[in-house]
Amino acid sequence: MSKNEDLTPSLFNSNNRNNEDKQENDIESKLQKRQEDFSNEENFSKIKESTMSNELSLGQNFRNKIFMQKRLKQNMITETTESLKNKLTIPLDWFEKCNNMNVQLSQFHEIIVAFRTQDIKQKYLGLVGIRKLLSLQNSPIQELIDVGVIIELIALLDNSPAEFQYEALWCLTIIASGTSDQANSIVIKGGIPKIVKLLESSIEELKVQAVWIIGNLAIDSYRIRDSLIKEKIFEKLLTILASTNQKQLIRQCTWALSSFFRVKPVPPYNLIKKAIKMIARAMVMLPIDIEFLADACFILSFMTEHYKETIKDLLELDIISNIIKCLDIDTQYIQISCLRVVGNIASGNANQTQLLIDRNVLDYLKKTLFNQKKTIRKESAWILSNIAAGTQKQIETLIEQDFLLTLSEAIEKDDPEIKKECIWAVCNLTSVENEKYIKKILDQGILRIICKCLEMKDAKYLAVCIEAFSNLLAFGKKSNPAGPNPVVLEVEKMGMFDILEKLQYHPVEIVYDKILKLLENYFEVAYIQ
């Protein structure tokens, strides 16, 4: 049989499925590494910027483009081909044979010949063959571009049967997950207008696949992303998200929208401000959908970090409770994104912080402060230190809920950088003015905690601890003005004077000045050498 004669799926008999399984495992490992890298930063002030930069540069990182391709395979094969069967123009048995066949790279020429024939069955066989070639571990994306396949795939998007449009879209989606030049070839060959047209298709799976290509293109580079913005595609995605109840389409639109935020420079606020409302609507519809929430929470985290105006919008939509509840989802990238949203709100005014407390955020922070992932613990400690720097009511709430004991446990067991944030929060608790609450933290052992912290080498935190110590001593003096200071007596009982003596000779001026002032105000000279 010549190569121009009919091909049958049985000729495509490689061990490709084993290769695809191996590729899925390789991609899973790479994704896991990307997630683990989240927890290896050393300085908290850098971690948010560093991690955000990593997220923003996904389009330039081929490893993460493979992750997008992985998502394509997992979701699309099982979900969309079933419903396409009702719209077929080719025999069902041929459709199934084509989709079940295996291919190998050595059949490249054979597949191209089949694709370019006029026979509809052979053409579909070749088209599926191209998609399967693209799904191989060593995907021949460039070779297919070099033989001119892209322009033919784009042509199929116009007025072709649904199964042809779907396969062509799928092929273009994988090509868009390649290098920047490969992705850009779709733009250069005029693919964008035809892809955008399919966003309006009445066939949901075509719409989903078109959305997917847009996400892969937007994540590639700011030039392609900005060309999509110019074509008002961001707004079109928002329109779809606002009008659909289909879960898969909501997931895909949210992911595609998130791609617009993952490339620097950040898009303008006046473009993206409507996204919050659409994401809020979707969060109500899919409150526990992990795939959707991963992208939705990333968008909200990014927006509250880079566009402070969106915090007000977020609060007005009243989805803070939904975001806080996501802290209970045991998925690292969802928890981190939600903690960043909470942290960005908590770093605002007192009313914003109070709203978080009213939505029971403290219940969740008690758990996330002891999460296995260091990054999550660090974010949680930072948020608590911000809340502890709030109003008297907010400090009292922390004390009422026994956060001194919670923070004390973290200080005792955690890494130094997390310990420092917790120390900051503990010291802030001493600024409470109500006698009832000062007595409570004294009873819970705050002097012991501060005593241990006075042995730290970090001058900044030493100064904070001395200030907190002064607050407690001032309370003791005020509570018994005519007699001995009960806090001084407790300090004496604990044997803290050796530490105080050493601090008199500290080389850092701010520590030296604060300790001298403390000793002069609250301790008799006889106690100090």
Positions of predicted regions on the chain:
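A detector of tandem-repeat and repeat-rich interaction/domain scaffolds
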Residues: 141, 145, 416-417, 460, ...
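Generic detector of contiguous secondary-structure segments
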Residues: 113, 197, 222, 238-240, ...
